[in-house]
UniProtKB/Swiss-Prot annotation:
The modification N6-(pyridoxal phosphate)lysine is found at residue 35. It comes from Verminephrobacter eiseniae (strain EF01-2). The keyword Isomerase applies. InterPro entries: Ala_racemase, Ala_racemase/Decarboxylase_C, Ala_racemase_C, Ala_racemase_N, Ala_racemase_pyridoxalP-BS, PLP-binding_barrel. GO terms for cellular component: cytosol. GO terms for biological process: D-alanine biosynthetic process. PANTHER family: ALANINE RACEMASE (PTHR30511), ALANINE RACEMASE, CATABOLIC-RELATED (PTHR30511:SF0). This is Alanine racemase.
Length: 371
């Protein structure tokens, strides 16, 4: 028998989250962002649930090829653009759209020979200072692209750095409006946080929104708001079972480094999940977990293959957890109880994004219970 740990992907949650995005931006087109293999969920697994989007956005040419192989004939956007000249030939062959964020990419386009002109998204560095042309250079980059026979359409985009926080988007939105004033072309500004928090403003919604983490049921502005506030459903459940129970006395310690000391008689459960499965090492005592649908906590240090949980809340509820009891590390328990991946990530000093993407290869993944 394999270890009892398993990640389950829920197609109904993916579909519901996409509908939630459309409710926020009924007049905009939606990019379903599936970079990092759909945030660890698997592009092939999420494809049918998200094919109601208007396009897919990702980074990797191999993943783009995979989407075409699945039968997708709509738009695919390469969010970091091309990395070398030969990538443009594949863009032509597969009909890919791609971001242009630097002079080197324009140079590659200028030297490219193809019968199929390219659709590009010209990126503005509105203040995040990762990728994109500075505002004072944006219009000249647009003019260079517009003069190329290799380019048939130029869309305009930027990425907000603080759509999820109190600084907001106003300065970067203003920079985008100034840089793109009177330029033709579709606009794309909103990431997940901006889509939920700022899309009431038509200038923010623009023509395309880029829905990423929101599709997978994580709140982009946690802890300011949780997933429930936004009406999102967890698309991934990581679950395992208890493989042992220990009875402790006052003063007994748990795990490596004796990080937890029992305050009195208590029972702990040993769950088959550890940091080698992608569960964060730094999720120590107090990290929330569900056992048979009841909320409790991790105690002690997470090991490579195991972690330990406090069974006191279950016993207080009149339950007798034991070998084989269900343990929900994040997501939805069989009882329907939900533990947000964002809460677990916060306890480990990280983000839900990282936990999704860090799921270990050794963890079996099913879609709606099917391998």
């Amino acid at each position: 028998m394999p270890r009892p740990i398993q990640a389950r992907i829920h197609s109904s949650a993916l579909q519901a989250n996409l509908r939630r995005v459309r409710q926020s931006v009924p007049d905009a087109k939606v990019w379903a962002v599936v970079k990092a293999n759909a945030y660890g969920h698997g592009i092939a697994r999420v494809f049918e649930s998200l094919r109601g989007a208007d396009g897919f956005a990702l980074l990797d040419l191999a993943e783009a090829q995979g989407l075409r192989g699945l039968g997708w004939r709509g738009p695919i956007l390469l969010l970091e653009g091309v990395f070398e000249p030969r990538d443009l030939e594949l863009c032509s062959r597969l009909g890919l759209w791609h971001v242009v964020h630097c002079d080197e990419q324009i140079d590659m386009l200028a030297a490219h020979r193809s019968q199929a002109p390219q659709h590009v998204f010209l990126k503005l560095n509105a203040g995040m200072n990762r990728l994109g042309f500075a505002p004072q250079r944006y219009r000249s980059a647009w003019a260079r692209l517009g003069a190329l026979a290799q380019v048939d359409e130029i869309s305009l985009m930027a990425h907000f750095s603080d759509a999820d926080g109190p600084r907001g988007i106003a300065p970067q939105l203003a920079a985008f409006v100034r840089a793109t004033q009177d330029l033709p072309g579709a606009r794309s500004l909103c990431n997940s946080a901006a889509t939920l928090r700022h899309a009431a403003d038509a200038s923010v919604r623009a023509d395309w929104v880029r829905a990423g983490i929101v599709l997978y049921g994580s709140a982009p502005d946690f802890p300011g708001h949780d997933a429930g506030h936004w009406g999102l459903q967890p698309a991934m459940t990581l679950a395992t079972r208890l493989i042992g129970v220990q009875q402790l006395q006052a003063g007994d310690t748990v795990g490596y480094g004796a990080r937890f000391v029992a305050p009195g008689p208590m029972a702990i459960g040993v769950a088959a999940c550890g940091y080698a499965d992608g569960y964060p090492l730094h999720c120590g005592t107090g990290t929330p977990v569900l056992v048979d649908g009841i909320r409790t906590r991790v105690v002690g240090r997470v090991s490579m293959d195991m972690l330990t949980v406090d069974l006191t809340p279950l016993q207080r509820a009149g339950l007798q957890p034991g070998f084989g009891s269900e343990v929900t590390l994040w997501g939805r328990a069989s009882s329907g109880a939900v533990l947000s991946i964002d809460e677990v990530a916060q306890a480990g000093g990280t983000l839900g994004y990282e936990l999704m993407c860090a799921l270990a290869q050794r963890v079996p993944v099913t879609l709606d219970g099917r391998a």
